Amino acid sequence: MRRQYHFRQVGQDIYIWDVHHLVELTKTFVIKKVALADIRELNEAYWFPNQSPTTQQIIEHFQLVEAADLSYPIILCAEGRVMDGMHRVAKASLLKHGDIFAVQFAQTPEPDFINVDEDELDYDE
């Protein structure tokens, strides 16, 4: 899996979770099915908040959606928000699935970083 991070605005701060770390934390979690209708991010500007994406950026996301493997569960925080797996959510929606496999934290873990510029994070595999 390519190195990636989950970013979330919390008050005035940006909380950042290392997705590899989230996957490790959830390895023993029970996998359940979640209705796509319950995934709020489908109706939000998830990948491009506060910006207008270029056509090339949209194409890159199409490619990631196409390559997404629905056999891997998405990761949800304690409140049911997506922390990992939005390309899988998009693929499931495009394929007209009613639900998707997911694991969910009972308590959302502390972020790995707070207010770190995304360009300063390690993206090497």
Locations of regions flagged by a protein language model:
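Short hydrophobic/aromatic-enriched beta-strand-loop microsegments
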Residues: G98-F105
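Residues that form or immediately flank small-molecule/cofactor binding pockets and catalytic motifs
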Residues: E79, F105-Q107
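N- and C-terminal low-complexity/disordered segments
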Residues: R2, A68, L121-Y123
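Glycine-rich short-loop/terminal segments
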Residues: M1-Y46
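Short, solvent-exposed coil/turn linker segments
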Residues: K33-D38, D99, N115-D124
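Short alpha-helix boundary/capping and kink motifs at helix termini
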Residues: T28-R81
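A sequence-level detector for short glycine-anchored, His/Arg-bearing signature motifs
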Residues: E79-L95
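Amphipathic, charge-rich alpha-helical segments that serve as recognition/docking helices
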Residues: N50-Q56, Q107-E125
